[in-house]
UniProtKB/Swiss-Prot annotation:
It is an enzyme of class 2 (transferase). Belongs to the KdsB family. Activates KDO (a required 8-carbon sugar) for incorporation into bacterial lipopolysaccharide in Gram-negative bacteria. It comes from Bdellovibrio bacteriovorus (strain ATCC 15356 / DSM 50701 / NCIMB 9529 / HD100). Keywords: Cytoplasm, Lipopolysaccharide biosynthesis, Nucleotidyltransferase, Transferase. GO terms for biological process: CMP-keto-3-deoxy-D-manno-octulosonic acid biosynthetic process; lipopolysaccharide biosynthetic process. The gene is kdsB. It holds the Pfam family CTP_transf_3. This is 3-deoxy-manno-octulosonate cytidylyltransferase. Its EC number is 2.7.7.38. It is found in: Cytoplasm. InterPro entries: Cytidylyl_trans, KdsB, Nucleotide-diphossugar_trans. One of its GO terms (molecular function) is 3-deoxy-manno-octulosonate cytidylyltransferase activity. It catalyses: 3-deoxy-alpha-D-manno-oct-2-ulosonate + CTP = CMP-3-deoxy-beta-D-manno-octulosonate + diphosphate. Signal peptide: none annotated.
Length: 247
Protein backbone atom coordinates (compact mmCIF):
# COMPACT_ATOMS: atom_id res chain seq x y z
CA UNK A 1 0.00 0.00 0.00
CA UNK A 2 1.37 3.39 -1.02
CA UNK A 3 0.34 6.33 1.18
CA UNK A 4 1.24 9.89 0.22
CA UNK A 5 0.84 13.10 2.16
CA UNK A 6 -0.31 16.25 0.39
CA UNK A 7 0.00 19.72 1.91
CA UNK A 8 -2.38 22.17 0.19
CA UNK A 9 -0.85 25.64 0.47
CA UNK A 10 -2.81 28.41 -1.23
CA UNK A 11 -1.31 31.91 -1.25
CA UNK A 12 -4.64 33.73 -1.03
CA UNK A 13 -6.35 33.81 2.37
CA UNK A 14 -9.18 36.05 3.48
CA UNK A 15 -7.87 36.44 7.01
CA UNK A 16 -4.13 36.08 6.39
CA UNK A 17 -2.92 36.59 2.78
CA UNK A 18 0.41 34.92 2.01
CA UNK A 19 0.20 32.83 5.17
CA UNK A 20 2.38 29.89 3.99
CA UNK A 21 5.32 32.27 3.52
CA UNK A 22 5.14 34.20 6.79
CA UNK A 23 8.24 33.98 8.94
CA UNK A 24 8.10 31.77 12.02
CA UNK A 25 11.35 31.73 13.97
CA UNK A 26 13.43 32.30 10.84
CA UNK A 27 11.63 29.89 8.51
CA UNK A 28 8.55 30.15 6.27
CA UNK A 29 5.49 28.56 7.86
CA UNK A 30 5.19 25.99 5.06
CA UNK A 31 8.68 24.64 5.84
CA UNK A 32 7.66 23.84 9.42
CA UNK A 33 4.71 21.80 8.14
CA UNK A 34 6.81 20.00 5.53
CA UNK A 35 9.49 19.07 8.06
CA UNK A 36 6.87 17.70 10.46
CA UNK A 37 5.26 15.64 7.69
CA UNK A 38 8.60 14.19 6.57
CA UNK A 39 8.94 12.55 10.00
CA UNK A 40 6.02 10.22 9.24
CA UNK A 41 7.00 6.55 9.04
CA UNK A 42 4.05 5.52 6.85
CA UNK A 43 4.11 8.17 4.12
CA UNK A 44 5.93 7.14 0.95
CA UNK A 45 6.09 10.73 -0.27
CA UNK A 46 5.19 14.28 0.78
CA UNK A 47 3.84 16.67 -1.87
CA UNK A 48 3.02 20.36 -1.61
CA UNK A 49 0.10 21.53 -3.76
CA UNK A 50 0.20 25.27 -4.36
CA UNK A 51 -0.77 28.08 -6.72
CA UNK A 52 2.21 30.34 -5.97
CA UNK A 53 5.84 30.33 -7.15
CA UNK A 54 7.15 31.65 -3.82
CA UNK A 55 5.55 28.77 -1.91
CA UNK A 56 6.91 26.36 -4.53
CA UNK A 57 10.45 27.67 -3.98
CA UNK A 58 10.16 27.50 -0.17
CA UNK A 59 8.91 23.90 -0.29
CA UNK A 60 11.52 22.75 -2.79
CA UNK A 61 14.20 24.25 -0.56
CA UNK A 62 13.42 21.56 2.04
CA UNK A 63 13.39 18.74 -0.49
CA UNK A 64 9.78 17.93 -1.34
CA UNK A 65 7.93 17.57 -4.62
CA UNK A 66 5.68 20.50 -5.54
CA UNK A 67 2.66 20.39 -7.85
CA UNK A 68 1.23 23.65 -9.17
CA UNK A 69 -2.58 23.73 -9.00
CA UNK A 70 -5.31 26.13 -10.10
CA UNK A 71 -5.96 28.94 -7.61
CA UNK A 72 -9.70 28.72 -8.36
CA UNK A 73 -10.22 25.16 -7.08
CA UNK A 74 -13.23 25.24 -4.72
CA UNK A 75 -11.90 23.17 -1.80
CA UNK A 76 -8.72 21.76 -0.30
CA UNK A 77 -9.92 18.29 -1.29
CA UNK A 78 -10.11 19.38 -4.94
CA UNK A 79 -6.56 20.77 -4.70
CA UNK A 80 -5.34 17.44 -3.31
CA UNK A 81 -7.17 15.46 -5.99
CA UNK A 82 -5.56 17.63 -8.67
CA UNK A 83 -2.12 17.21 -7.08
CA UNK A 84 -2.21 13.40 -7.18
CA UNK A 85 -3.59 13.12 -10.71
CA UNK A 86 -0.30 11.63 -11.96
CA UNK A 87 0.79 10.04 -8.68
CA UNK A 88 0.42 6.30 -8.11
CA UNK A 89 -1.00 5.85 -4.61
CA UNK A 90 -3.71 4.05 -2.65
CA UNK A 91 -4.26 6.53 0.19
CA UNK A 92 -3.68 10.27 0.53
CA UNK A 93 -3.37 12.22 3.78
CA UNK A 94 -4.44 15.88 3.73
CA UNK A 95 -1.93 17.76 5.91
CA UNK A 96 -3.01 21.33 6.58
CA UNK A 97 -0.34 23.81 5.51
CA UNK A 98 -1.14 26.10 8.45
CA UNK A 99 -0.35 23.44 11.08
CA UNK A 100 3.37 24.08 11.66
CA UNK A 101 3.61 21.79 14.69
CA UNK A 102 2.05 18.76 13.01
CA UNK A 103 3.89 15.56 13.93
CA UNK A 104 4.73 12.42 12.03
CA UNK A 105 3.02 10.44 14.78
CA UNK A 106 -0.29 12.25 14.22
CA UNK A 107 -0.11 11.67 10.46
CA UNK A 108 0.68 8.00 11.02
CA UNK A 109 -2.38 7.54 13.24
CA UNK A 110 -4.53 8.57 10.28
CA UNK A 111 -2.57 6.48 7.79
CA UNK A 112 -2.69 3.40 10.05
CA UNK A 113 -6.49 3.32 9.69
CA UNK A 114 -6.07 2.23 6.06
CA UNK A 115 -3.31 -0.24 6.86
CA UNK A 116 -5.71 -1.89 9.32
CA UNK A 117 -8.79 -1.58 7.07
CA UNK A 118 -8.07 -0.96 3.36
CA UNK A 119 -11.83 -0.69 2.71
CA UNK A 120 -12.20 2.47 4.82
CA UNK A 121 -13.19 5.57 2.82
CA UNK A 122 -11.88 8.35 5.06
CA UNK A 123 -10.32 9.01 8.44
CA UNK A 124 -10.13 12.18 10.51
CA UNK A 125 -9.26 13.43 14.00
CA UNK A 126 -11.21 14.73 17.00
CA UNK A 127 -10.60 15.53 20.65
CA UNK A 128 -12.74 15.97 23.79
CA UNK A 129 -14.94 19.04 23.69
CA UNK A 130 -15.53 21.57 26.44
CA UNK A 131 -18.89 23.08 27.36
CA UNK A 132 -17.77 26.40 25.86
CA UNK A 133 -16.69 24.78 22.58
CA UNK A 134 -19.95 22.84 22.46
CA UNK A 135 -21.87 26.12 22.25
CA UNK A 136 -19.52 27.86 19.78
CA UNK A 137 -20.55 27.89 16.12
CA UNK A 138 -16.85 28.21 15.23
CA UNK A 139 -16.15 24.76 16.73
CA UNK A 140 -17.14 21.90 14.45
CA UNK A 141 -18.60 18.95 16.34
CA UNK A 142 -18.74 15.29 15.40
CA UNK A 143 -20.79 12.48 16.91
CA UNK A 144 -19.64 8.90 16.40
CA UNK A 145 -21.03 5.38 16.58
CA UNK A 146 -19.74 2.47 18.67
CA UNK A 147 -16.94 1.87 16.14
CA UNK A 148 -15.80 5.51 16.26
CA UNK A 149 -17.18 6.18 12.79
CA UNK A 150 -18.71 9.60 12.12
CA UNK A 151 -22.49 9.87 12.27
CA UNK A 152 -22.72 13.62 11.66
CA UNK A 153 -20.71 16.86 11.74
CA UNK A 154 -22.24 20.19 12.72
CA UNK A 155 -21.47 23.70 13.86
CA UNK A 156 -24.52 23.44 16.11
CA UNK A 157 -24.36 21.82 19.59
CA UNK A 158 -25.23 18.14 19.32
CA UNK A 159 -26.64 15.83 20.36
CA UNK A 160 -29.52 17.79 21.84
CA UNK A 161 -29.39 17.71 25.64
CA UNK A 162 -32.16 18.58 28.07
CA UNK A 163 -29.43 19.70 30.47
CA UNK A 164 -27.74 23.08 30.23
CA UNK A 165 -24.20 23.22 28.86
CA UNK A 166 -22.92 23.80 32.40
CA UNK A 167 -24.78 20.74 33.70
CA UNK A 168 -23.74 18.58 30.78
CA UNK A 169 -20.09 19.67 30.95
CA UNK A 170 -17.90 17.95 28.38
CA UNK A 171 -20.25 15.53 26.65
CA UNK A 172 -18.84 12.12 25.87
CA UNK A 173 -21.22 11.69 22.95
CA UNK A 174 -19.73 14.64 21.10
CA UNK A 175 -16.15 15.49 20.07
CA UNK A 176 -14.51 18.56 18.59
CA UNK A 177 -13.50 17.86 15.02
CA UNK A 178 -9.97 18.57 13.77
CA UNK A 179 -9.88 19.27 10.03
CA UNK A 180 -7.18 16.80 9.05
CA UNK A 181 -8.18 13.92 6.76
CA UNK A 182 -6.98 10.81 5.02
CA UNK A 183 -8.85 9.37 2.04
CA UNK A 184 -8.70 6.28 -0.09
CA UNK A 185 -7.72 7.45 -3.56
CA UNK A 186 -10.90 6.01 -5.07
CA UNK A 187 -13.16 7.76 -2.59
CA UNK A 188 -11.38 11.11 -2.99
CA UNK A 189 -12.05 10.94 -6.74
CA UNK A 190 -15.71 10.09 -6.10
CA UNK A 191 -15.98 12.93 -3.59
CA UNK A 192 -14.54 15.55 -5.95
CA UNK A 193 -16.72 14.44 -8.85
CA UNK A 194 -19.93 14.73 -6.79
CA UNK A 195 -21.79 18.06 -6.52
CA UNK A 196 -22.01 19.73 -3.10
CA UNK A 197 -24.79 18.23 -0.97
CA UNK A 198 -27.57 20.33 0.53
CA UNK A 199 -26.40 19.54 4.08
CA UNK A 200 -22.85 20.52 3.11
CA UNK A 201 -24.02 23.90 1.81
CA UNK A 202 -26.27 24.47 4.83
CA UNK A 203 -23.45 23.94 7.36
CA UNK A 204 -20.56 24.99 5.07
CA UNK A 205 -18.76 21.73 5.93
CA UNK A 206 -17.42 19.73 2.99
CA UNK A 207 -17.10 16.53 5.04
CA UNK A 208 -20.90 16.33 5.05
CA UNK A 209 -20.73 15.58 1.32
CA UNK A 210 -18.77 12.45 2.23
CA UNK A 211 -21.46 11.33 4.68
CA UNK A 212 -24.16 12.13 2.11
CA UNK A 213 -22.34 9.84 -0.34
CA UNK A 214 -22.42 7.04 2.24
CA UNK A 215 -18.75 7.14 3.21
CA UNK A 216 -17.35 5.38 6.25
CA UNK A 217 -15.28 7.96 8.14
CA UNK A 218 -13.12 6.66 10.99
CA UNK A 219 -12.65 9.22 13.77
CA UNK A 220 -9.35 8.96 15.64
CA UNK A 221 -9.45 10.39 19.16
CA UNK A 222 -6.50 12.54 20.23
CA UNK A 223 -5.93 14.43 23.48
CA UNK A 224 -5.81 17.89 21.92
CA UNK A 225 -5.48 19.73 18.63
CA UNK A 226 -2.17 20.89 17.22
CA UNK A 227 -1.68 24.64 16.98
CA UNK A 228 -3.03 26.12 13.74
CA UNK A 229 -2.35 29.55 12.28
CA UNK A 230 -5.41 31.28 10.83
CA UNK A 231 -4.63 34.91 11.69
CA UNK A 232 -1.64 37.14 12.50
CA UNK A 233 -2.73 36.93 16.14
CA UNK A 234 -2.43 33.13 16.00
CA UNK A 235 1.11 33.52 14.64
CA UNK A 236 2.07 35.84 17.50
CA UNK A 237 0.70 33.38 20.07
CA UNK A 238 2.60 30.51 18.45
CA UNK A 239 5.86 32.48 18.44
CA UNK A 240 5.40 33.16 22.14
CA UNK A 241 4.70 29.45 22.78
CA UNK A 242 7.81 28.36 20.88
CA UNK A 243 9.94 30.93 22.74
CA UNK A 244 8.66 29.62 26.07
CA UNK A 245 9.79 26.14 24.99
CA UNK A 246 13.25 27.38 24.07
CA UNK A 247 12.74 26.96 20.33
Amino acid sequence: MKIVGVIPARFGSTRFPGKPLVNLKGRPLIQWTVEGAKKSKLLSEVIVATDHEGIKAAAEAVGVKVVMTDSDLPTGSDRINAAIKDVACDVVVNIQGDEPLVTGELIDRLAQVFVDDPKMDMATLAHPISAEELQSMNSVKVVVNCRDEALYFSRYPMPYSRMSAQEAGSMDGCLKHIGMYAYSRNFLKQFCEAPPALIEKAESLEQLRALYLGAKIKVIRVKEASVGVDTPEDLARLEKLLSSQGM
